[in-house]
A protein has these predicted regions:
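OB-fold single-stranded nucleic acid-binding module
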Residues: 21-31, 44-47, 51-96
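Extended, charge-rich, solvent-exposed interface segments
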Residues: 78-144, 221
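OB-fold nucleic-acid-binding modules
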Residues: 1-12
Length: 310
């Protein structure tokens, strides 16, 4: 049974992804496990009462066979797990039932991205981008763009990057003052080092943040990677610094995670393109869960509800 289809009182069994596992103790001193179960339709919080193992926090991102009961707590769906074991090699389940995938044609999107990079007029920016694609391309094609807020599915980063580059190419043609090569290069590279920020599960989902991801973040990691690549290719220092600035400033303001504020026309534009694409995906994902003619629940990332009109 898909999580999205579970209703209060339903008994269920099947294969689910284990997320956010924590071992806890009741007030009476009895051990239990709290975790999130996930599949391609959503997630639900669950408890395994009187449980001492073997499953624990080290199994985040793995698949388990589970039987249990769907219920509610204070109006929110949850589940009680009666039986749980890690999936085995010969178990019959489809990864496509468990993992949400970007609604794009992966190969065609990747080919478009490569062709667009080849079209950059500036040879220095083009060289950096092509080398970075060679280094990080495999991860770019697979990983999500975020753990949960937006594009949190396999191929999400590729989709996010490609959509932003299409918009960037349009705006570069609209405003003559914008350096197309710099804008598209910065757009391509802005989230590249999320592959170092995240620890991904064997299924390609974000299990947690890496040590470097927590202490440095993908902006700093990305700027460092570009700096190293620019040095390797003997790119002029100012161009290297401009690319690093694009990455470090793409969150717009320090309160939103930017290391510095945008200080050139291309970095200003990039920060808005990133905001627009992430917001549009947040709206899209939540509208799919909100019946026509009704309001959603409060969306943490937007700090408001949204209305899904006919």
């Amino acid at each position: 049974m898909l999580i999205h289809d579970m209703k209060n009182g339903d008994r269920f069994e099947g294969y689910y992804i284990l997320q956010n596992i924590a071992q806890r103790t009741t007030a009476a001193g009895k051990p239990f496990l709290t975790l999130n179960l996930g599949d391609r339709s959503g997630t639900v919080t669950a408890q395994v009462w009187d449980y001492t193992g073997p499953i624990g926090p080290g199994d985040v991102g793995k698949v388990a066979w589970i039987s249990g009961l769907a219920s509610e707590y204070r109006g929110a769906p949850q589940a009680t797990v009666y039986r749980i074991r890690l999936a085995e090699e010969n178990d019959d389940f489809r990864v496509s039932d468990l993992v949400a995938t970007a609604p794009i044609e992966m190969d065609k999107t990747w080919d478009w991205l490569v062709d667009t990079v080849a079209s950059l007029e500036d040879g220095d920016y083009r060289a950096v981008c092509q080398e970075m694609l060679g280094t990080y391309g495999k991860q770019l094609r697979l990983i999500p763009a975020a753990k949960s807020v937006h594009h949190g599915f396999v191929g999400g980063l590729l989709m996010h990057t490609a959509y932003m580059m299409r918009a960037a190419d349009f705006y570069a043609g609209l405003y003559p003052a914008v350096d197309r090569s710099l804008l598209l290069a910065g757009t391509l590279l802005h989230d590249f080092c999320k592959c170092e920020e995240f620890v991904t599960s064997p299924l390609g989902l974000v299990a947690e943040y890496s040590l470097k991801g927590q202490l440095l973040g993908h902006l700093v990691l990305g700027a460092e990677a570009v700096s190293r690549m620019a040095d390797k290719l003997h790119i002029p220092e100012e161009k290297s610094v401009l690319l690093q600035h694009m990455i470090l400033s793409h969150h717009g303001e320090p309160e939103f995670g930017a290391a510095v504020r945008p200080m050139c026309i291309e970095s200003e534009l990039l920060s808005y393109l990133d905001l627009i694409d992430s917001r549009m995906e947040i709206y899209t994902e939540n509208m799919e869960e909100t019946p026509v003619g009704t309001f959603s629940g409060k969306i943490f990332a937007l700090d408001k509800r949204i209305y899904n009109h006919a």
